Amino acid sequence: MGRYLVKWVDLSYKDCTWEKKEVIADKEMIAAYERRQHIPEWKLAPLKSKAERVALGEKSMLKFKEGKVSASEGAEAKTLRPYQWEGFRWLKNNYNEGKNSILADEMGLGKTIQVISLMEHVVHKWTWAWRVRCSMQTQQPILVIAPLSTLGFWRREIESWTSLNVIMYHDNEGGKEVRRLIEKYEWYYGNGQVPESVDHEVFKFDVLLTTYEITIADVDALMP
């Protein structure tokens, strides 16, 4: 690929520019982009039998033993505090039983981390449950709706604690046109410049961050 569409830090999506590979100094960013261009096998893996799903769930919990969550393969895992681990297990059990949950701890006790741990667990460790519940043959992403002032915090924490691909469906300087740009280049696998190459069946991102107002405005685009 000769050029990359660059989203500059702290600038709007409308300020994106096409740049040649050789002038981009951060080669790790290029490598990360290239990795995101390939559909992971786990997103397309066939649904398993009930016995296989139970075994997968047990194996999953072993990986999460002691509340360790890793941002990437081979990276040093971060550890949840005991009460955060207990909160995560409660969220997980409610999710498995199809129950809604509300965390109402005081500020600063790690509610966000507990929810993020559940996201990592659901997407990478408990994939089958998500797909069976949604009757989907491919993995579906997670939608996080939060106040605008907290979106940056959510993104930093998700990137710090997990290996999930998270994008922010919001732009301070752009309206619907900019959101269509995000959808065109960030949502699906394939080349946004070549419509026929885009696979609309599998989402590239794992987590979409946005606000309540944008959710209402773009409800048709965000509906599963």
Q: What is each model feature region?
A:
Residues 47-224:
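ASCE P-loop NTPase motor core, strongest for the SF2 helicase catalytic module
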Residues 1-75:
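Long, charged, low-complexity intrinsically disordered regions
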